[in-house]
Curated annotation (Swiss-Prot):
Pfam families per record: Thioredoxin
CDD domains: TRX_family
One GO CC term, this protein: cytoplasm
Tissue-specific expression: Expressed in ASJ and ASI ciliated sensory neurons. Expressed in the intestine (at protein level).
Domain Thioredoxin: 2-114
UniProt site positions, description: Deprotonates C-terminal active site Cys: 33
S-S bonds: 39-42
Name listed for the protein in its UniProt record: Thioredoxin-1
Task performed by this protein: Participates in various redox reactions through the reversible oxidation of its active center dithiol to a disulfide and catalyzes dithiol-disulfide exchange reactions. Shown to facilitate the reduction of insulin disulfide bonds. Might play a role in the reversible nitrosylation of cysteine residues in target proteins, and thereby contributing to the response to intracellular nitric oxide.
Gene that produces this protein: trx-1
Amino acid sequence: MLKRCNFKNQVKYFQSDFEQLIRQHPEKIIILDFYATWCGPCKAIAPLYKELATTHKGIIFCKVDVDEAEDLCSKYDVKMMPTFIFTKNGDAIEALEGCVEDELRQKVLEHVSAQ
């Protein structure tokens, strides 16, 4: 399942699929956080991801439950959790694997400043 973090510290479920989100925002960076509810490192980095989502409104932050979105996991070759895929128009432009807080923060800042 694909969830989009809104900017009021909540997560809402999308009824639409990822391709529709891309069509709606072709020029925006979309960050996909591939996580699992049972994953300890995913839980550890979740507060930072939420903070980034509320701070950087020029980027769309989504959470993808790997147990419910095998097609997206396959498309982006996700092998571990958490994995963060930075996309533009559906194409992966950057990927981070693991609970890499400093790297995640740095990559988000790079993409925000490039817009």
